[in-house]
Regions:
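C-terminal (or distal) subdomains of carbohydrate-active enzymes
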Residues: 4-405
Length: 405
């Protein structure tokens, strides 16, 4: 970070690689006050609660599940009729072999819904928070559902006291979007996996690695599930009106916990925390931004200072993934950036005043100068002044840059 004579300390902050507000790699306060209007909360009949922020309208049933998630800007209802978003499900988990590793396809077809109740509704810094308690015998789940002012994102935080045997816990996130594929995050790229299973190969992908997010979209609209702390999920069509012969949406379920009995009969028993979010009107940029914030750790007593380097996307989506000192001990700054959406992109490199006059050149991934001749380069003109250097990226291209004073 850039050195100053004096910098304010932020009590709690996050530093994320990519943000939609242009504050990537800056320390951003937790629960920072906003000028947007506070979220409206209203108690409805039968113990239901309505949350509205002018962008989203959320109806939470008395059992803590969500019966309506309405994108008011687009008039799009995202919870299919007859389903509930945020419902916990217990599945049988008794694989024939590798008890703590395998997931049987058939186990995903038999789920028992857990029941819960709303405990409290409160507001803080304009955000509305609904606290839900869900229990099954000795297992207790406390969920905080949060809607923030002006946000396209509905956030979930779960504290789970897990005491099950041979059970598998998922949370159901049905979306009123009909799609045959979902787009998943992977390192330095995206990967598409089937929702509609047409072949034996498709059927074998009944559980998928989720990384930080999955985007489900049709030709005109998409939503994303942002994943903060779990790695597996399954996606399948939701059957609609049989007479009309069409589906009504996509069932997306995050895998939270299992309870194998071998080799350790107490595997995962105890307390766990999980975070996930649902982003409406999702784009790759919006999903990346939400994923960056959700996955960034909360830091304490963080100096409010300028990052040593930053990248301004001129067009397309370029992410500055990390920065570090060079391995050779020279004191040079190494920066890794990549194109994240699968298209062409142009960007401009910026450095903080402490590095004024520094030069930049592109290296290979091992920080060496011998670039491969059969790979594209992002820095077209070789070594040059670091401030304002122009970068060009192809789809999912990554670049390693060395900044030298």
């Amino acid at each position: 970070m850039c050195i100053r004579d004096r910098a304010d300390l932020l009590a709690e902050a996050r530093i994320s690689q990519f943000r939609n507000d242009g504050a990537s790699w800056h320390a951003n306060r937790i629960n920072e006050p906003t000028d947007a209007l506070s979220v409206l909360t209203q108690t409805l009949d039968n113990g239901r609660v309505l949350l509205a922020n002018g962008v989203l309208s959320v109806t939470i049933e008395a059992d803590g599940t969500i019966s309506s998630l309405l994108d008011e800007e687009h008039g799009r209802e995202l919870v299919p009729a007859g389903t509930r978003l945020g419902r916990y499900e217990l599945l049988k988990d008794e694989p024939a072999v590798w008890d703590a590793w395998e997931i049987e396809r058939e186990s995903l077809l038999m789920a028992n819904a857990m029941t819960g109740s709303i405990e409290s509704v409160d507001t803080e810094n304009g955000a509305a928070r609904v606290r839900v308690r869900t229990a099954d015998d000795d297992t207790v789940i406390t969920t905080i559902i949060t809607l923030r002012p002006g946000s396209h994102t509905l956030d979930f935080h779960a504290d789970i006291d897990w005491h099950e045997r041979e059970r598998f816990l998922k949370v159901a996130l049905p979306l009123g979007i009909v799609a045959d594929q979902a787009t998943y995050d992977c390192q330095y790229g995206l990967v598409r996996r089937p929702i509609v299973k047409n072949t034996a190969s498709d059927e074998a992908k009944y559980e998928s690695s989720t990384n930080r997010f999955a985007i489900i979209g049709d030709a005109g609209y998409a939503a994303a599930v942002i994943n903060g702390s779990v790695y597996g999920s399954d996606a399948s069509p939701i059957a609609g009106n049989a007479a009309e012969g069409r589906d009504s949406g996509t069932m997306f379920r995050l895998s939270l916990l299992s309870a194998p009995t071998f080799p350790d009969p107490r595997t995962d028993i105890g307390s766990h925390e999980f975070d996930w979010s649902v982003v409406t009107d999702a784009t790759v940029d919006r999903a990346l931004g939400a994923a960056g914030v959700l996955n960034a750790p909360v830091l304490h007593d963080v100096p409010d200072i300028t990052p040593l380097a930053s990248i301004e996307s001129v067009n397309g989506t370029v992410v500055l993934d990390w920065m570090k000192l060079a391995d050779d001990g020279s004191g040079d700054l190494i920066v890794r950036a990549y194109e994240a959406a699968g298209g062409q992109a142009d960007a401009t490199l910026h450095i903080c005043p402490a590095l004024a006059g520094a030069s930049v050149h592109e290296t290979n991934v091992l920080e060496g100068d011998n670039l491969a001749t059969d790979l594209p380069v992002a820095l077209q003109d070789g070594r040059q002044n670091a401030e304002g250097a122009t970068l060009h990226f192809g789809p999912f291209q990554l670049a390693t840059l060395r900044i030298t004073r």
